[in-house]
Regions:
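Short Pro-Gly-centered beta-turn/loop motif in secreted/extracellular proteins
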Residues: 6, 12-21
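A short, solvent-exposed beta-strand micro-motif common in secreted/extracellular proteins
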Residues: 19-29
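Oxidative protein folding and maturation machinery
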Residues: 57-384
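Short, internal strand/loop/helix patches
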Residues: 276, 439-471, 477-479
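Conserved redox-active cysteine motifs that mediate thiol-disulfide chemistry
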Residues: 386, 394-411, 428-430
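Conserved helix-turn-beta segment immediately C-terminal to the redox Cys motif
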Residues: 388-389, 406-426, 497, 502-504
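Thiol-based oxidoreductase modules, predominantly thioredoxin-like and allied folds used
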Residues: 419-434, 444-458
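Thiol-/selenol-based redox modules, centered on thioredoxin-like
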Residues: 476-505
Length: 505
């Protein structure tokens, strides 16, 4: 949040907060670390000439104490630790257990030094408030947990030693402070801790997931489908026994017969029909098991689960299934968290209701049926625009950088309208609902814009031909139809325009 400075150096800013919250004022210059509370009004004075800092308000004692006696802590993240202590760089996934534990010992020492300095300060200034002392002690603990959990990205095979995690759990997580909004680092600490715990949990068996929700009545199976799922595991076990002692060719034949059988066909049809419901049910199940494992209360449980659903909608760009919304309304009691999910869900519900049937920007792919070779598929798609410079954008609705780039589509079209171009967007692994919603949301439309959402095998064939290895990927085709070996990334518009000028000569 920011506000313009008046001529006399004043500013006014309103910040929405749920609870007592740590904030940084004048970020990038003064880095003032303080606390604000909902419903309160504060007057901040920062005299850059004299160095005097003062907070006035209904209850501003803690803020003034923090400014007069700021935190004294020397925590190093892993990269800084290796740079300044070992004079070397550290790569992701490279640290052996011994090295991880050495870093833990270093951080423990830093924490002890910070606590000792605080003890000394209390002796020197015995009238410091209990709130100030508790705030700093808990800040040091939360900050320590956040730094330590970042180590998971540097540990060998991304696995932390048990003793390391035991320390984090007992000395940091078990001592976490409330409200959870109090410290900025609590968000990173919680996310990293929960995600790491979640990585150690086994996935939910898909067959069991379907049967469980069928029993609950949250999904509906026909009697034939239900029987197929109930029989599936037994049939798999029979297959396992049947292939024992068989030759490789015999095993291959038995497995192919099983996979091509009616039972597997019935099961796969259900998975396809209920893919959104099952994916969302698995997400909820995983979130619930993580929160149970870390023994957190209802507030964190609701927040973490709602956050997972919010991120899912944001990533998929499509609304949740009806059964998921019913579960959310029934089980998430934290009103703020539930309302955030429902608001985002309604946004994509509204986008999904938009009529896209007459859009000329969604290209027909009927003429591609039966074509399997990547170059041939691509040539067929771009055939109507021969003679134009064509920018190909290979993207996915699940790809955040792709969607970020699409926010600026109209700026791109306006800048390049003098160069007689066509913009072709090829979606990777994106459901039709998500695909259309993203196009609508970011207005990725225009006279010279086309979108295709090919079947997986055809999209893969085109990407193999183009040698796609990241998303988004951009490719340029000149007026003669040649695929150019150039950096065609339009996110740097100035460089891209210069490239198109050269190509168009």
């Amino acid at each position: 949040f920011n506000a313009p400075l008046e001529s006399e150096g004043r500013f006014k800013i309103t910040v929405p907060v749920l609870n007592t919250t740590q904030v940084y004022v004048d970020w990038g210059r003064s880095y003032i670390n303080t606390v604000i509370e909902p419903g309160e009004t504060y007057y901040f004075l920062d005299d850059v000439k004299t160095g005097q800092r003062l907070v006035m308000g209904k209850d501003a004692r803690l803020q003034n104490e923090l400014w007069a006696y700021p935190e004294e802590i020397g925590y190093y993240n892993v990269q800084r630790y290796y740079r300044e202590v070992h004079h070397s760089k550290v790569a992701f996934g490279s640290l052996a257990d011994k090295e991880v534990m050495e870093y833990l010992d270093f951080m423990k020492q830093n924490k002890q030094e910070a606590d000792s300095l605080l003890d000394l300060r209390i002796k020197e200034h015995p009238h410091l408030s209990t709130r100030y002392v508790n705030y700093l002690r808990n800040y040091y603990t939360t900050n320590l947990g956040a730094y330590l959990m970042q180590t998971r990205f540097y540990a060998k095979d991304y696995k932390l030693p048990k003793d390391f995690m035991d320390f984090v759990t007992t000395e940091c997580w078990a001592r976490r402070s409330v409200p959870y909004t109090l410290y900025c680092d609590m968000n990173d600490f919680t996310n990293d801790y929960f995600e790491y715990i979640g990585e150690g949990l086994s996935g939910t068996d898909a067959i069991d997931l379907v049967l469980t929700h069928d029993q609950k009545g949250t999904i509906t199976l026909s009697e034939t489908e239900r029987q197929a799922f109930q029989n599936y595991k037994g049939e798999v076990e029979q297959l396992r026994k049947a292939v024992e002692g068989c030759t490789v060719e015999e095993k291959k034949a038995l497995v192919e017969d099983f996979n091509n059988g009616e039972l597997v066909a019935q099961v796969n049809k259900v998975f396809i029909r209920l893919q959104s419901e099952l994916r969302e049910a698995d997400l909820i199940d995983r979130a619930q098991r993580v929160t149970e494992k870390v023994k957190c209360g209802s507030v964190l449980r609701d927040f973490y689960t709602a956050h997972a659903l919010y991120d899912y909608i944001d990533n998929m760009r499509q609304p949740l299934a009806e059964m998921t919304i019913d579960w959310l309304n029934e089980n998430i009691k934290l009103d703020f968290a539930r309302q955030q999910v429902l608001a985002l869900n309604e946004k994509y519900e509204a986008l999904s209701r938009k009529d896209f049937s007459n859009s000329t920007n969604l290209l027909s792919t009927d003429n591609l049926e039966g074509i399997t070779e990547g170059e041939q598929i691509l040539r067929k798609i771009i055939e109507p625009w021969k003679g134009k410079i064509i920018l190909i954008d290979v993207w996915g609705t699940w790809c955040r950088p792709c969607k970020e780039a699409m926010k600026h589509s109209q700026e791109l079209y306006e800048r390049m309208k003098a160069y007689d171009m066509f913009f072709l967007y090829m979606a990777n692994n994106s459901s039709e609902t998500s695909w259309k919603n993203v196009i609508n949301e970011y207005n990725v439309t225009g006279e010279n814009v086309g979108h295709v959402n090919l079947p997986t095998d055809q999209q893969s064939a085109v990407e193999d031909f183009l040698k796609v290895n990241s998303y988004p990927s951009y490719f340029l085709i000149d007026r003669e139809g040649h695929l150019l070996e150039v950096n065609a990334d339009p996110r740097n518009l100035d460089q891209f325009e210069e490239l198109v000028k050269r190509v168009g000569k």
